[in-house]
Structures are given as C-alpha cells and as structure tokens.
Amino acid sequence: TPEYQTKDTDILAAFRVTPQPGVPPEEAGAAVAAESSTGTWTTVWTDGLTSLDRYKGRCYDIEPLPGEESQFIAYVAYPLDLFEEGSVTNLFTSIVGNVFGFKALRALRLEDLRIPPAYSKTFQGPPHGIQVERDKLNKYGRPLLGCTIKPKLGLSAKNYGRAVYECLRGGLDFTKDDENVNSQPFMRWRDRFVFCAEAIYKAQAETGEIKGHYLNATAGTCEEMMKRAIFARELGVPIIMHDYLTGGFTANTSLAHYCRDNGLLLHIHRAMHAVIDRQKIHGMHFRVLAKALRMSGGDHIHAGTVVGKLEGERDITLGFVDLLRDDFIEKDRSRGIYFTQDWVSMPGVLPVASGGIHVWHMPALTEIFGDDSVLQFGGGTLGHPWGNAPGAVANRVALEACVQARNEGRDLAREGNE
C-alpha cells in the first residue's frame, strides 16, 4: 500500500528482502508485512470480526539496492496496538517470529527498526545510564577501562580473585567475568562472587578509586539468576553482568528492573549475536539488537571494536554506538541508520569495545569512541610480559596520555602511537 502515510506511533521496520526467482518485489514485501502482523495463508471468516485496516502491517515503500538486482529494501509499518507494552520479547516474536522461514523468500534481514516514543516510553530502559554511572563511580572525562579475566575457564575462585585484584590495583576500573563463566564444577558462582568482592574492596582501599567486577549472573533459570543478583547486592559490589541473547529478553528485563531498584549497574554481553547478525542477507543487523537492549535495559553493551576492520565498518559501528548513547539520532543511510530515532529521555548505554585490542590501539580507540565508552583489554592486559598489574598500569597510562593529548588539542588520528 504505497499510499499509506506512516503515523508517529507506528513501529517502522526496514527489511532487506531477497525473494525467490520469479516472485515480484511488491508481492514479497506485502507477504512480509502480512505474515508478521495479522495475515494468515488464507482468508478466514473471523477476519470480518475485526477491523483489519486498523491492525494490519503495511509495506509502504520498496527501494531497489544499487548493485544488487536480486535484493531490495522493503519498509513496513506496524500499528502500535499489535505489540504488548514493555515487552521486547513480544516485539521480536511479532516482527521476526515466523516470517524468516517464508517460502516466497530466499533470505530476509531486518536492517533497522524505528521505535516510536509512544512505545519506548513503556520500557524502563537502562537501569542507570551513562550519567548516573559516572556519578556512582566518580569517574569523568575519560573512557572507562576494563579487562576480561583469562583463562576464561579453569581457574579456582581464589586464583580468579587474585587476578581481579592485580588488574584493579594496577589501574583498571573494571574486570569482567567471561560470558561463559556461570557456575562450573571448578568454580561455583558463590565462591567466585566472594573472592571477587574481596579483591574489589582491597583494590579500592589501596587506590582510593571505585572499582568493579562484572559478576556474571546468567544462569539456567530466571530464579537462579535473581538469586545471584541478590547475593551480589548483599556483598555490596557495584555491577553485575548478563548475557542478554542467550539469557533471553524476558530474563534480561527482569534483571534490569532489579538492578535499578537496588542500585546495581548492569553490564551486558552479546554472546550469540553473530548467529543472528553475521550474514549480510539474512537475520537481523546488530543495530536492531542494540536498540532492543536499550529498551530491555543494560548500562554497558559490547559493540565491536572498529580497529583493524574496514573503514566502511567504522561508520556503521559508530551509527549503532550513537543509537546506544544519544537521545536523538538522525536518519543517515551512510551509517546504516534507516530511520530517525528519538529516544526522548531514555538513559543511554555505554558501548564496550572488546576483543583483540591492546595498548597500541589506544589512540585510535579514544579518537573513535570518545569519552563515553568502556575499553576492554583481556589478553591486552594479562598478556603483559611482566604480569597483570603492569599490564593494567600500561593500559591506564596509555589512556591518560591519549586523553591528555586530546585535551591539549593534539590530533590522535594523525599522531598515532607516538
């Protein structure tokens, strides 16, 4: 229905559609709109008992992709009433639930969603957000530093705590449980929580700075997850963590509500994201998963590194980094942003750069991500030839040097590692 005027309250979706040979774009686009809203495979008499005009998804625009004759972008508008308030789970079940297995399509990818304020306002969003986090930690004007404790699996709780202490003592703000550290036979969660809390308090006392360790509360059941979160709060630690895709949006949103009520920061890891977002023609782009997380709730989320990747990737990555941090993001196709997104007053999420980065990337990282980010060096800290603490010191010194140079007006991108 090309004559349809989108409403401010509609949820808009941009799909990259690859139809089967012989299926016209209009038909494929309409099929996507119907299957992800009110349609079924045949006309049913109960359709007469409701006003389909009011409730059906509409494909309102189709645009060809330059250089791809078999693909195009289909824009679909969904009426707000199709979705349960405050449920990312329901949003995804509706929009991407069934339609991706559709016979008439060879492949389908959800590139972007426009979430109207009327819908985003039904979510709590991040437990605290960027500003409140800085106030809690008393750290301003620079990116935060983190480090994932390696080897990720196999350390005893006592040795794990020791590694945490050394990194924090050396000058990092945070250390992190790996995403797959939950509660395994060699290190049960309660032992880990206790030893990490000890490490945090010792490092805080010795450095006079607030420290944290992302205690991974992800578990096999929601009840067990909450039990871990509650234990972390009782220990008085500042931050916990969750794997939001493997744990699920329902669990994540519950945890985010608990974190706001109890003053815990929530670090989010995106384990499993590549299963969904890796393919260029099928699945969902990470910017959609990032928007969903901002609604569901998290104070940090992993967002890739940019460094060492292609230049084109940089704009796309910064596009969804801004979607996480800013209140208002203009439509900009060169950055992969298909819709203008207005978050109104929903708190922002700190993007976490993590994975294969080390101290020589520091100038590039501070220049690309700016102050509102968490830079995480795992092997880049623990792999230091002299040990964890000197590795942490090296990272902190490099960061402070880069920030100082930038504040003095030097161009980090040009001067690089000198």
UniProtKB/Swiss-Prot annotation:
Main location group: plastid
Cross-referenced CDD domains: RuBisCO_large_I (cd08212)
Cofactor requirements of the protein: Mg(2+)
Catalytic reaction annotation: 2 (2R)-3-phosphoglycerate + 2 H(+) = D-ribulose 1,5-bisphosphate + CO2 + H2O; D-ribulose 1,5-bisphosphate + O2 = 2-phosphoglycolate + (2R)-3-phosphoglycerate + 2 H(+)
Marked site positions, Transition state stabilizer: K309
Cofactor note: Binds 1 Mg(2+) ion per subunit.
Post-translational modification: The disulfide bond which can form in the large chain dimeric partners within the hexadecamer appears to be associated with oxidative stress and protein turnover.
GO molecular function terms attached to this record: magnesium ion binding; monooxygenase activity; ribulose-bisphosphate carboxylase activity
GO biological process, one term: reductive pentose-phosphate cycle
Localization per Swiss-Prot or TrEMBL: Plastid, Chloroplast
Residues involved in substrate binding: N98, T148, K152, R270, H302, S354
Catalytic class of the enzyme: lyase
Residues the entry annotates as binding Mg(2+): K176, D178, E179
PTM sites of type N6-carboxylysine: K176
Active site annotation, chain numbering: K150, H269
Domain of life: Eukaryota
Keyword Chloroplast assigned: yes
EC number, UniProt record: 4.1.1.39
Keywords: Calvin cycle, Carbon dioxide fixation, Chloroplast, Disulfide bond, Lyase, Magnesium, Metal-binding, Monooxygenase, Oxidoreductase, Photorespiration, Photosynthesis, Plastid
One Pfam family hit: RuBisCO_large_N
Function: RuBisCO catalyzes two reactions: the carboxylation of D-ribulose 1,5-bisphosphate, the primary event in carbon dioxide fixation, as well as the oxidative fragmentation of the pentose substrate in the photorespiration process. Both reactions occur simultaneously and in competition at the same active site.
Subunit composition and interactions: Heterohexadecamer of 8 large chains and 8 small chains; disulfide-linked. The disulfide link is formed within the large subunit homodimers.
Entry-linked HAMAP family: RuBisCO_L_type1
Additional notes on this entry: The basic functional RuBisCO is composed of a large chain homodimer in a 'head-to-tail' conformation. In form I RuBisCO this homodimer is arranged in a barrel-like tetramer with the small subunits forming a tetrameric 'cap' on each end of the 'barrel'.
The protein, known as: Ribulose bisphosphate carboxylase large chain
Gene source species: Pinus virginiana
